[in-house]
Amino acid sequence: MKQKIVVQLSAFILFLALLPFTGIGQTKNVISTHRVFPKIDKIAEFEKAVANHAQKYHAGDNHWRVFAIQSGPDLGGYHITEGPKSWESEDARGDISPEHQNDWNKNVAIYLTEKQSGGYSVYQESLSTIALGDFTDKIQITHVYPKPGQGDNVVAILKKIKKAWEASGVTVAVYASSSSGPTQYTLTTRYKQGLKERAAGFRKPFKEVYETANGEGSFEQYLKDVAEYVQESWSELLFMRKDLSSK
């Protein structure tokens, strides 16, 4: 009887020890993105087809949020995000179903140009000022590309910027690219109060807030660090299209 209790206790302890690893493995902090560009004369047909596709085949971990790109080099394109999900669920996703893939190929892709891009990103909680799932309809995405070998230094820059965001109430979700071209951090500003947050005077100047959060003279060092460690950065505005997204 005593031996049986010891065996059961050992098994229970092993179960508890494995729980943290199970939790880590199932963290839903991954999103996949797909940018597509419809033919100029087929926009209405594309929108109808992509809405039907999203609402029929994309739910749960495969939920779609579809954005219209309003500015920047990809103006006129559509930015599709899938997730959040875990790597495990992405591993099991496959093509979702033969019907799903057939619908995309025959009913959606026929309206697209050859231009497209896509990738994976992982949400960085330690660099963000808003929860992963706290979405908004209007966003700005800033794409930041570190110089080769300078990723850690760019993260250090972002940690200081986060202090300024927190001080001024700016809500930003930060993602790191994963196996998707050059190393990139995407800073997604989620406008909780709409585009009026962009207006001059809505918040204190960034330089003032940054120096309050990081110390007098810190903004000058920030500019030097950006010049030294960042290869390139650019921004764009995107508007959510609920009518084209998953329900």
Give each language-model segment a name:
Residues 1-28:
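Bacterial Sec-dependent N-terminal signal peptides
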Residues 24-247:
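Short S/T/G/P-rich N-terminal loop/turn motif that feeds into the first structured element of a domain
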